[in-house]
Amino acid sequence: MARQKIYQKDLGYDILRPIVDWNVKQSYRRVAVKGQENIPTDGAVILAPNHCNTLMDALVILRANKKETVFGARADMFNIKLVAKIMFFLRILPMVRQRDGLRNVLKNKDTEEIIVETLEHGVPFCIFPEGKHRAAHSLQVLGKGVFRAALSANAKFGDKKPVYIVPVGIEYGDYFRYHSTSLVTYGKAINVTEFVKSLEVENEAQMIEPLRKELTKRMSELITYIDYNEDYDGKWTLTRLLSLRYKNTLEEQMRNNRRIISEIEQKYEKAPEAMKSLLDKAAKFDKVRRKKGVSIYSFAAKNSFTRIFVKTLAALTMLPAYIFSAIASLPLWGISAILRKIIKDRAFKNTATFGVRLAGCLTYGPICIALAFSFLPWFYAIFLLLLMIPTYPFFYDYNEFIRRFVSDIRLSFNPDLKKFKDDIVQTYRTL
């Protein structure tokens, strides 16, 4: 029997959930979840993550929080009835934005009531306060939706159990390349019930602004945060150049990035003109190295003949596995390649690649199983199927390895580019 309420148990959802979670994990080379102890267990929980990588943000949050969670998504995705039904099945509610017009915004009142009911029944609700995605290590202005939902819930049952907003930071190794890394960090929760009492005001608008300020602060502390202004590109490029020598856990990498950015900001305050000039130079360097097809990672180590020779041997050694992977996963990466060319918003490309993987797991996988056991002895069939499992991500990993390998060779023939990078780093250290 289908569930009547979005937060109720559903057998189909429970069967699909572990399959989705497994595919999400396999879509990243490394994954990490930190701060789960910060999720309260004594009240209603609203999760508030940053929004930088379209649907993948919701998927990594879903996998990171094993508890059943209801999500909010932009309302225009629900315009088609079939899509709306699928969204309901996936526990996703429509969230109307101000840009959708006042008449539509009023519909949020109905959604708000469902959110409050969901929270009252102990099911977490996840909403992206920024309202729209932006592939950048920064934050946009937080919308009012998350605070209105929290205040409505607090008004209804805050006297029985507290309402919390948990800030969440999502960090990716790359926004656009498939099979990178993902880090989810839960921060210290804001006890909205206690926060409202401390304000001693009754006007909702007066409550929202302090909450917005506090949540923005806590969210920015959970990611590699850079103010999104004209110096953003220069600061991010400089941060990457200075962090190349550090190879730690995902959490340590993020903390190291934050330390470097803090140092950059301090130097900017002391010597604004010199730092402005350096950041402009860093932004120019980034454009030049991209134009020459040189990866930022090629600057991490000296590109000696020995290093290139070893990489050549590695590429040749892995080539048979790559050919097998390319053939075995051809229907998947072929469709993915077509979709990635069609999609204009680069931030959606990883979502498309994941979608193909998930669809392949549910369709192409069973077909391969049926064919393998139809034409091969069972032990050969099992062996072949086990070999096929990692082929999709390995195909992308090998392509990335070759991309960086070619980049290393290009850099070895571009000493001026290496000198350009060294000049930026040395200048920074003297400021």
Label the model's feature ranges.
Residues 6-203, 321-431:
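Soluble catalytic domains of membrane acyltransferases
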Residues 213-298:
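Long, charge-rich alpha-helical interaction segments
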